[in-house]
């Protein structure tokens, strides 16, 4: 085991603070409408230019191991806030730095670190209550657009795109962000349920020009096994043929003989049919087939449920107003499933999302939820250069997460104003001793830091602005974009309550841990051995 170096008390905390300051100073320049860009070097390809706080934080590794420990702990604040709220990473970093700087001064002056932490925790709980009280619901398209605009660094086109996407697929719908092909931003919306499996034979195509199959008001058969014998399908095919309607078959697979029979019957016009493979794999496939069955009102034909294909009849088929099948995708629009059954299925998926352990599982469940509850919207980001594309995609992603957070927990006045207004909740709050009272006072001062940083980045005098905002009430604040004061909500400068709350809680939590640190342990780097002396060249004397 390698030898370790141990630092204690003030020396350890000073090193840790140096690391925190290095990381926070790089991150906080991005805050606010006049925040600056940070250029990140990449081991291959062009450097990345970004205004996304968490992207900057993730790139920073310091040479000094003790300073690096401090930087990594604050990096945790940024990434945790991003995970929970999707935005607010820079605000969280600024708050953590402000709290830690003042907290370590207090410890150096002889105050008890544990009491300081208790005071900070007590004040944080009170501030969170006040933020929730200040919060207003965010449900109308205008508020959603404003939140998206602010989070995308005052880019109104991004705010409008997100508001349009939410209006079309609902607040539960899946909205994804992709790199577009052109210079303009685009919004593509897929209504109904779409899955990535196309027809099993191009001979099912009804539109030969663009090779699609359009089925109006079709019956839908959903099976979780391979169909190899056409006899198993005869009762269903006869019933569908008599009705004069089309049939969509979704099965694990349809083997060659059965597929050939279906194709021939389709081409002769005996029965209009299209067969597609079931989406997904394993247990996820069964779950998705059950989703489709619920959406269309079909009975899921599965031997696990004691249902055999040969026993299937017309009663077991579902319907939809329209189905479109291409070589790659199948879209079911306006399924005829019962609203109650669909709502019940949605609640089951929501419960599974809450219990999911991995991001992958959670993402797949979210996709299933969206397909059942509304649809999928894809925002395609356009830009002139690849560097601009990456930077813009990061901003749109942030804005999307912030908007979802706003819909979930509501909105407060932006630009750091909500934290200033929440200060009044600390009036009269006292701890059990003077050191706890100092912890409360520390947080009262630290929550001014985001507003101060926004003003500094805009080239203003932070103390003047903070005093002006404090002297007024309600949503009155400072608009750094055009250097004016006024009602932040009316000016469309809003922050999601969840983002502000998460930033505050994570910053206070990490600062409390770092203030109470008394020792740091790191490995001692072994000096690399000197290079061996080169041997003499053949036929020549050795070099001296």
Swiss-Prot record:
A GO biological-process term: protein refolding
Main location: cytoplasm
Residues binding ATP, per UniProt: 30-33, 51, 87-91, 415, 479-481, 495
Catalytic activity of the protein: ATP + H2O + a folded polypeptide = ADP + phosphate + an unfolded polypeptide
Keywords on record: ATP-binding, Chaperone, Cytoplasm, Isomerase, Nucleotide-binding
One GO MF term attached to the UniProt entry: unfolded protein binding
One protein family per Pfam: Cpn60_TCP1
E.C. number(s) listed in UniProt: 5.6.1.7
Chaperone keyword on record: yes
Cited InterPro entries: Chaperonin_Cpn60_CS, Cpn60/GroEL, Cpn60/GroEL/TCP-1, GroEL-like_apical_dom_sf, GROEL-like_equatorial_sf, TCP-1-like_intermed_sf
One cellular component (GO) term of this entry: cytoplasm
Cross-referenced Gene3D superfamilies: GroEL, GroEL-like equatorial domain, TCP-1-like chaperonin intermediate domain
Uppermost EC category: isomerase
Subcellular location: Cytoplasm
Alphabetical list of NCBIfam families matching this protein: GroEL (TIGR02348), PRK00013.1 (NF000592), PRK12849.1 (NF009487), PRK12850.1 (NF009488), PRK12851.1 (NF009489)
UniProt function note: Together with its co-chaperonin GroES, plays an essential role in assisting protein folding. The GroEL-GroES system forms a nano-cage that allows encapsulation of the non-native substrate proteins and provides a physical environment optimized to promote and accelerate protein folding.
Subunit comment: Forms a cylinder of 14 subunits composed of two heptameric rings stacked back-to-back. Interacts with the co-chaperonin GroES.
Entry similarity comment: Belongs to the chaperonin (HSP60) family.
Name of the protein described by the UniProt record: Chaperonin GroEL
